[in-house]
Amino acid sequence: MASSSPLQAAAGDRLLPGGPGPSPEAEDDPGEGFEFDDSDDDEDTNAGPDVPRSALETEADTPLIHLDSAPVIDLEPKPEPAQPQTQRPAAVSNGDAVDAAFSEVQRSGWRRKSSRRIERFTFPAVEEDVIYDDVPCENLDAQQPEAERNQPYEDARQDRAPQEPEDLGWSSSEFESYSEDSGEEAKPEAEPTKHRVSFQPKMTQLMKAAKSGTKDGLEKTRIAVMRKVSFLHRKDVLGDSEEEDMGLLEVSVSDIKPPAPELGPMPAGLTPQQVVRRHILGSIVQSEGSYVDSLKRVLQDYRNPLMEMEPKALSARKCRAVFFRVKEILHCHSMFQIALSSRVAEWDSTEKIGDLFVASFSKSMVLDVYSDYVNNFTNAMSIIKKACLTKPAFLEFLKRRQVCSPDRVTLYGLMVKPIQRFPQFILLLQDMLKNTPRGHPDRLSLQLALTELETLAEKLNEQKRLADQVAEIQQLTKSVSDRSSLNKLLTSGQRQLLLCETLTETVYGDRGQLIKSKERRVFLLNDMLVCANINFKGQLEISSLAPLGPKYVVKWSTALPQVQVVEVGQEGGPYDKDNALIQHAGAKKASAAGQAQNKVYLGPPRLFQELQDLQKDLAVVEQITLLVSTLHGTYQNLNMTVAQDWCLALQRLMRVKEEEIHSANKCRLRLLLPGKPDKSGRPISFMVVFITPNPLSKISWVNRLHLAKIGLREENQPGWLCPDEDKQSRAPFWCPILACCVPAFSFRGLSLQLGALVHSPVSCPLLGFSAVSTSLPQGYLWVGGGQEGAGGQVEIFSLNRPSPRTVKSFPLAAPVLCMEYIPEPEEGDGRNGDKGCPAADASAGVHPTICLGLQDGSILLYSSVDTGTQCLAACRSPGLQPVLCLRHSPFHLLAGLQDGTLAAYPRTSGSVPWDLESPPMCLPVGPGPVRALLSLEEAVWASCGPRVTVLDATSLQTQQSFEAHQDEAVSVTHMVKAGSGVWMAFSSGSSIRLFHTETLEHLQEINIATRTTFLLPGQKHLCVTSLLICQGLLWVGTDQGVIVLLPVPRLEGIPKITGKGMVSLNGHCGPVAFLAVATSILAPDILRSDQEEAEGQQAEEDKPDGPAPEPAPVPASHVGGELIRKKGILLQYRLRSTSHLPGPLLSVREPEPADGSALEHSEEDGSIYEMVDDPDVWVHNRPCARDAHRKEICSVAIISGGRGYRNFGSAAGSPGKPAPCGETDSTLLIWQAPLTL
């Protein structure tokens, strides 16, 4: 009943000694299309560099063990000891599945992280000679004593090999080192039995501690396990010994299936929030149960049968590569499900769930296991795809399993669930947090849990992106000849894939007719653009079972600086400029007619033909107008007024059609590429036109092309560095790029010091489609400063282009110390609930304003709508104290003064939003100056010295105060909020601290100096001078001009810092005076394609918005309109009323009675004019209902201000690129981030 060799007992199931997963150098390279060798023997020879040949041969020659197989005899038999009489469940075998018992067995554990391969934990020497059975005994459960059958964890250390299919713990590979290294024979049974008997109570006790220990956190349980269990102390060190020590606790559950987590009956008297929290908890339990069942199905329905199948439909090595880390992921969630059951049982008494998520998913083991799975996912799908194409048995197996499954979910649908799991958790925890009131004991733990899950999901997303990038580049490299220069560029390791998408290349004729179109795969690398043909081979029907990857054939490639985006109509009107003077790639020479017109219309042929028809119709109507002017009679609806209306309507329709053609360009990407020079040596360019799937795709391409070109400049090579980074890592693709460096003031002769900067977002409708994608955030920058003891200066820059441009500057009486941008009030912001703070009247026309605080105590209010710099209001602070900081809330304009006073100006309902004429409410905050203000939803934070005072946002009553720093001589200078935390910087020291917004608890402290030591090796004293949080990044400016970038969570959790961060190699020669953000939201109409606009217009036709003065026409009157609609033209315009005109109504119908009930216009009028009394229809189409839910596009730029410009990456003594500003001039550095799509 037992084999004499544990090694052979699990040879078909164990992981190779060289590593548990697929080798990166294996034959199944991710993304390979169809060139492969079907020989499993050849594949096993390339399993990996760390696998010895003997191990591979042993695995290849060793058959799998089945339930009905005979024992495998070792090549060198040893004396076989007497078999123990210990009984065990019949469902247990060495790595073989018994479907009835699969769902009852769960294993979980911690493992040691290794940089190259997983470490295997081993049992002590006294246990290493345990005999593993190969063939299970049948019906042993009936012979087993009742006392042993009732022990829930009795099989934790049975003398047998662990299960593989239903066993969710270790496979026999974890124990193979003992069978390989140990040359001793098996010892008598008495000693192993003794150790086993003494071990079982310990395991039972530890398991009970693991279940109850979740109340205090799994970390304590892990420490206890690691300290008490001796076999966890000994392990084979296969990786870096400096990695984090982690044990692996194997947990086995009895054959009796544990009850699923289930909430008890709802108690009476629960609040609505408690009821909602119970429902959300039920959703978490149900979602987790479904996820665990899906993981079990992957192992039970796919992996185990494939491993047992004879003949093999998939080799053992490929099978392990496909299902790599699935079992370990199931371990993590099985333990989480056990802990979740305990929490559900005690929910009504504790109502805590957040700390369980923190304890379960903050371990490095979870990140390691999921990272391995995510990184291997592309490779796994590639193996499945190739097996479907070459092995009909495997394809039939997948189809049969899908048909037999209750929900018809494919293997791909099951295996993609781990990638989607954490976003699902985040949504559930967000709902739970929204329904958890402040002060609840679970609120802080939920916020921490949300942070942990978001951080984990971000890391997995980044790793998945990098894995996909590598796979795409590898697939592209295989399509290029080994001797070509492109192959050398791709294999150099210096190329980064920024964007990759399947686009449709189109070729139009001289009249807009479509000549041909074909799908191309376009690759945007960091320094080149590659276009490839897509060739699919094999059976396309397998794409429903696994993603079908293409094989590429490179068509052309070009250096990125030579690529130009040519936008139709960017220089002029859309109709006059909708042409191309350059021959299209693949198109024939233009015809004589096209050459005569010197225009090649690239718009869709339907729109172009309709525009031509409108031009002809307008010429006919103009002739009719001339004939109408010759009529001798006077008719009500046939006169010059009506004829002029016809002409106006057609002209408006032509403008609408031109806009539709321009809208079609929103999905048309035109690239001007360099070609081979002609015979005379002149450079020739050719045009390539791609049709993108939607306008969002084109915006992304134009934006990434623009930023990629900027990234090739000297100052951005490199622009960011990670401290202690390895040689292969680069700045992420989302990293902001230095776009420009400009002087802050136009008068360079004056030594003006920077004070503050704000961005006023103003949409510019004149910008073209590509200009919106490449320009900085639309609007104006207001830069304020001045000279000490002299006057001040304000400079206004326009950002409606790729580089800022000065539009106006004006002097002030004193230097500007602070600025605040105040947007127009929104409806429902809570002001109506306060009787003391009247709401602003919407009809008063309150526009966005900019408030300036000066050194002489002046507070100035300017309109930010235009650059007229009209001062709306002005006042002086109490005691003429310098205004150090300004903040606004829905109720007050707050000013922090030099003498420690907080001045509050109430909101008014007039055109000026704040009452600056009346004396303000003065609140003493402390003895020192009020240096920083922060406006939260329900509170206002004011700093004075090292203390921070929390005030009520409505009444400004002091709620509480706390010390942010222990040194009385240190002041809080900056406060920025993100999620549920506030980061603070101080007047001295290089540390920043994080505080909770609700409990005011100090959560984290980060020393910035450790991030800058490699740039400033001799610098010991560093001070933080500015802070900014934007798009999940914490920007930190220092007094040495260095800017540090640290990642922080974006959601409602705690914004703690977990990553290393990056340091900018572009900075200032002096302290960073400020860090500001410029943000603008692109108009939703820019995302509407021509098809959506046509649908929106049709919806407008079917259901007019607003009352129409004309009655709805009868069905007979729809004939003319339908004929017009069939041609794609709808005559919609504002009709001038003709009822007041003299003369009878010209109609074939009998005249209506002249009474009060007569209609002003007859049905014939409606059939002719299709009247819509809305001038907006002429120019703009109303948005569809779906557009209300369209995701916004956010354009972001970060601006830093300081003295001069300095590149820290240039070598000492090297001239480098000349700085655009002097070392003493006030300078603005502008970083542009990729559009947030």
From Swiss-Prot:
Gene3D superfamilies: Dbl homology (DH) domain, Pleckstrin-homology domain (PH domain)/Phosphotyrosine-binding domain (PTB), YVTN repeat-like/Quinoprotein amine dehydrogenase
Domain DH: 276-463
InterPro entries found in the cross-reference section: ARHGEF10/ARHGEF17, DBL_dom_sf, DH_dom, PH-like_dom_sf, WD40/YVTN_repeat-like_dom_sf, WD40_repeat_dom_sf
Keyword Phosphoprotein: yes
Subcellular location: Cytoplasm
GO molecular function, one term: guanyl-nucleotide exchange factor activity
GO cellular component, one term: cytoplasm
Protein purpose: Acts as a guanine nucleotide exchange factor (GEF) for RHOA, RHOB and RHOC.
Identification of the protein by name: Rho guanine nucleotide exchange factor 10-like protein
Organism of provenance: Bos taurus
